[in-house]
Amino acid sequence: QLEDRGMSLNGVVLLSSIMNYGVRQPGYPQNFVTLLPTYSATAWYHRKLAHPAATVGEQVQRARDFALGPYASALAKGHMISDAERAEIVRQMSELTGLSPTFIDNANMRVELSSFRKELLRDRRQTIGRLDTRYLGLDDDASGDSPEDDPSSSAVTGAYFGVFRDYVANELNYKTDVEYRM
């Protein structure tokens, strides 16, 4: 049907699955609320919690309840939050994420994913993966703000690339002599 309308397919463009870049804008707390359970599961997996739940599912539920309740409410208050409430939110976040209260407070209770990936295992001089937080990496600069690389991406890129090339060639019947680089 595209050719009937004067358009020919001349390649494949893969885009990120993110549907709303607006959630990443300053002042919009939803991204932090939805990431907190993942942070908690990651801290549970890497044994960084002082009082972990018995299972990762229970840990995630604890974090989800906190994130959707007290944490979301605290972020919505912005600078109007009381010092006492802020201190309590920071304390609970620390218990759920394994991050220090000072780090969380300095981040204004809004811990970016790259910062979390660098900070959680900083004491071991390790970083965690972005796509799969079970993967570990080592940075040359342990004092940096964010990881130098994504160990989870490095681990799966070869397999992903092979499957992608097979899919494009055999399912989409796209043939080319041009080298595809990732």
Give the predicted meaning of each segment:
Residues L2-P101:
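A catalytic-pocket lid/entrance helix-loop region that shapes and gates access to the active site
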Residues G78-M182:
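Alpha/beta-hydrolase fold catalytic core
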